[in-house]
Amino acid sequence: DFIGPYRDIPAPDVYTNAQVMAWIVDTYSQLKGYMVPEVVTGKPIPLGGSLGRDTATGRGAVFCTREAARVRKMTLKGASFAVQGYGNAGSNYAEILQELGGKLVAAADSQGAVLSKKGIDAVKLLKHKEKVGTVVGMPGTEKISEDELLRTECDILVPAALENAITKDVAKGVRAKVIVECANGPTTPEADRVLDANGVFVVPDILANSGGVIVSYLEWVQNLNRLRWTEEEVNTKLEDKITRAFSDVHETSQKEKVSMRTAALIVGVGRVADAIKTLGLWP
């Protein structure tokens, strides 16, 4: 068994969705001879999926943005932000941050990018994309390149597409005060050093996009115990866990005088090391 509820539990990512998770549950359960909903997360609700899972990655990143704004003494009301990658995570992030007073000024997908200094309605932009297949052509915006988006003057830059979007050359032109990594590995190591030297506050992917994994864990717990939490309960648990995680990482960053990325690794590896030491040696 390569996967299993106590071995390895897949969840949706690029080019997969709840339907794909449903197929995996069905196939695995057929092989086992009984229903095993806890073998994957991000499932459709009727198959044991968790309420709030579809927005969890974006919502968790917004919670991290709120905490970053707090420690950097920024206000979210009126804060401008640009989102590179207007898929599930990026669009949910934009909609939720907009509700908190943020102003979306630029967005991109695989077809191109758009800009409007006056602001773009996040909900209308998603509807436009669903209708025509791209954010390009959104009324009231001008088309720009993806590189121009990454260099857009804004308070918050959100890479929410694929890895290595922010290279060393791109980093030199970044004008955002804060970067919140919704994507996995969007910043190269060389770019990371440039951003750090330029005083850009980076909330690393291991922390910023952990909302999806956190709610996947909550879905797994619900499945194992045959529970069903409300969306409000799930969001509250997500907020509590990711806010405490941010606090731990930021505290370590300040104490050790390292970047948030290095601090996140120190915290994570430290917890595993503590657990191993507590186990002792066997035999």
What are these regions (language model features)?
Residues 7-11, 34-40, 106-109, 158-159, ...:
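General beta-strand structural signal in soluble alpha/beta enzymes
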Residues 1-49, 274, 283:
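N-terminal ligand-binding/catalytic initiation module
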Residues 68, 172-283:
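Adenosine-phosphate binding glycine-rich loop
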Residues 41-44, 49-153:
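Glycine-rich phosphate/diphosphate-binding loop of Rossmann-like nucleotide-binding domains
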Residues 15-19, 23, 52, 56-63, ...:
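Conserved active-site and cofactor/substrate-binding residues in soluble primary-metabolism enzymes
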Residues 3-12, 34-38, 73-80, 253-265, ...:
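Flexible, glycine/charged-enriched surface loops at secondary-structure junctions
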Residues 112-202:
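Rossmann-like adenosine-cofactor binding region
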Residues 7-9, 45-53, 204, 254-258:
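A short glycine/serine-rich beta->alpha loop
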